[in-house]
Amino acid sequence: MDLKESPSEGSLQPSSIQIFANTSTLHGIRHIFVYGPLTIRRVLWAVAFVGSLGLLLVESSERVSYYFSYQHVTKVDEVVAQSLVFPAVTLCNLNGFRFSRLTTNDLYHAGELLALLDVNLQIPDPHLADPSVLEALRQKANFKHYKPKQFSMLEFLHRVGHDLKDMMLYCKFKGQECGHQDFTTVFTKYGKCYMFNSGEDGKPLLTTVKGGTGNGLEIMLDIQQDEYLPIWGETEETTFEAGVKVQIHSQSEPPFIQELGFGVAPGFQTFVATQEQRLTYLPPPWGECRSSEMGLDFFPVYSITACRIDCETRYIVENCNCRMVHMPGDAPFCTPEQHKECAEPALGLLAEKDSNYCLCRTPCNLTRYNKELSMVKIPSKTSAKYLEKKFNKSEKYISENILVLDIFFEALNYETIEQKKAYEVAALLGDIGGQMGLFIGASILTILELFDYIYELIKEKLLDLLGKEEDEGSHDENVSTCDTMPNHSETISHTVNVPLQTTLGTLEEIAC
């Protein structure tokens, strides 16, 4: 029996695509690539498959586009804590300089900066001053035969700024006595200020285990309005208010009290209920935050306020070759002349182009404190006489100078506000996988089947191509070498013995 296939029988053999279609797990293609002629059924299956594939591509492209839009969602949660670290509290008297501490040398160097004297070192508007204050100022501003001495802005602010030891009438933390020694001196744009629970100098951070009044910081202050500088003009440093400015902030964040602080007025007891918020932001491309671990030139931990102060410091040093007292670094302090002529105008110019020069992004991890303020009038009619006797001050003085500040946690919990990626890679793969299963019944393994088929197809084509090239090369060598050898042997005499003929055959094999 002849096993060789006839041409008609060979044409009925399935092609490789038909074999793949009938063995693949991809739905629908086995009905398209069937044995036999083209039918309407095959066409309908092809249309259905192509349509499903098109819908899959549309839905998948929409999901991919949504993923690369880098959307985020915000999760808010309340967490109950066993204890909470009490925040840092920075407070500044709105009057930065005590009038009684000014000397003739101070007025000679800084009188114009303080707006007490004009450019000629004269009192500009004496009719606006209180007679007693005017007389004291005239005595201090008498520069006849005066020889000026050296002047230091740092020493000046230390000496002339309000002393917390004199301002503080009492202090309690969680019902326990505290004092001025529990505060750290810091410098801000308001001059000499004080920070409670700074954690500096190796002091442990104070904690609280209860919420509500009586479980935080309570202080009574005398703002000493009698020491306020007289005002007869307006400058950048002029303040018309009386009281203290307070900022509640994290210990890792420097105070920026001139913009982030709130005011506390004399004659009132102010209650500040606060709640800690822990915020987590996403870095680019999902958000715009910057890692808190990426320090700055003058601060080890990044924060918005640290970035602002760092930027202002670099700008002033670059333009004025000095720095203000509240600015970090090792550049020399600005003189009063540099303050008025360069530093203050430079800060004003910087504020105008702040968005272009000082780009301070939100840190990825941030702790802030929400505040709810309420206040009551002090003293009451029944307590006025007692306070007059206790502090040896009149009722009018108490209402104009004394204030009480009570800061406490509203409850022993904190709020977390966290940005999360709205759409991650796992969700993208899940959606695309679901669409693949819905429209074409495919999976990852089906994709691997396609790649495997393409690989085998390419390998077969390459092997066929290489086989043809080898066959052609072998045929050429047989014609050129092996055909010439017999011709060469014909020239040999017939008397050649058999061993020689055997040797010749071996050489022919090697040559071929």
From Swiss-Prot:
Looking up InterPro entries in the UniProt record yields: ENaC, ENaC_chordates, ENaC_CS
Q: Any transmembrane segments, and where? A: 43-64, 425-439
Tissue expression notes: Expressed in brain, cerebellum, trigeminal sensory ganglia and also detected in testis.
* Protein's UniProt name: Acid-sensing ion channel 2
* Protein's UniProt keywords contain Ribonucleoprotein: no
Membrane topology is: Multi-pass membrane protein
Gene3D superfamilies noted in UniProt: acid-sensing ion channel 1 domain, Acid-sensing ion channel domain, YojJ-like
**Would you identify the family this protein belongs to, as annotated?**
Belongs to the amiloride-sensitive sodium channel (TC 1.A.6) family. ASIC2 subfamily.
**UniProt-annotated glycosylation sites, renumbered to this chain:** N365, N392
A GO BP entry: phototransduction
User: GO cellular-component terms in the record?
Assistant: dendritic spine; neuronal cell body; plasma membrane; postsynaptic density membrane
Recount the known activity regulation.
Inhibited by the diuretic drug amiloride. Inhibited by gadolinium ions, the heterotrimer with ASIC3 being more sensitive. Heterotrimer composed of ASIC1 and ASIC2 are inhibited by the snake venom mambalgin-1.
Instruction: Report the subcellular localization.
Output: Cell membrane
Which parts of the chain does the record assign to the membrane side Cytoplasmic? Answer: 1-42, 440-512
Q: Which organism is it from?
A: Homo sapiens
Coiled-coil regions listed = none
Cystine pairs annotated here are C92-C193, C289-C364, C307-C360, C311-C358, C320-C342, C322-C334
Which residues are recorded as modified (Phosphoserine)?
S8, S11
Give the motif span (GAS motif): 441-443
The UniProt subunit note reads as follows: Can form homotrimers. Heterotrimer; forms functional heterotrimers producing channel with different properties. Forms heterotrimers with ASIC1; while ASIC1 determines current amplitude, ASIC2 influences the properties of the current. Forms heterotrimers with ASIC3; resulting in channels with distinct properties. Interacts with STOM; STOM regulates the gating of ASIC2-containing channels. Interacts with PICK1; promotes ASIC3 phosphorylation by PKC and activation of ASIC2/ASIC3 heterotrimers.
Concerning PROSITE patterns, the annotation shows: ASC (PS01206)
Please describe what this protein does.
Forms pH-gated trimeric sodium channels that act as postsynaptic excitatory sensors in the nervous system. Upon extracellular acidification, these channels generate rapid, transient inward currents that fully desensitize. Highly selective for sodium, they are permeable to other cations. By forming heterotrimeric channels with ASIC1, could contribute to synaptic plasticity, learning, and memory. Additionally, as acid sensors at nerve terminals, plays a role in mechanosensation and phototransduction.
Q: Which GO terms describe its molecular function?
A: ligand-gated sodium channel activity; monoatomic ion-gated channel activity; pH-gated sodium channel activity; voltage-gated sodium channel activity
Q: Which UniProt keywords apply?
A: Cell membrane, Disulfide bond, Glycoprotein, Ion channel, Ion transport, Membrane, Phosphoprotein, Sodium, Sodium channel, Sodium transport, Transmembrane, Transmembrane helix, Transport
NCBIfam families referenced in this protein's UniProt entry, alphabetically: ENaC
Topological domain (Extracellular) residues are 65-424
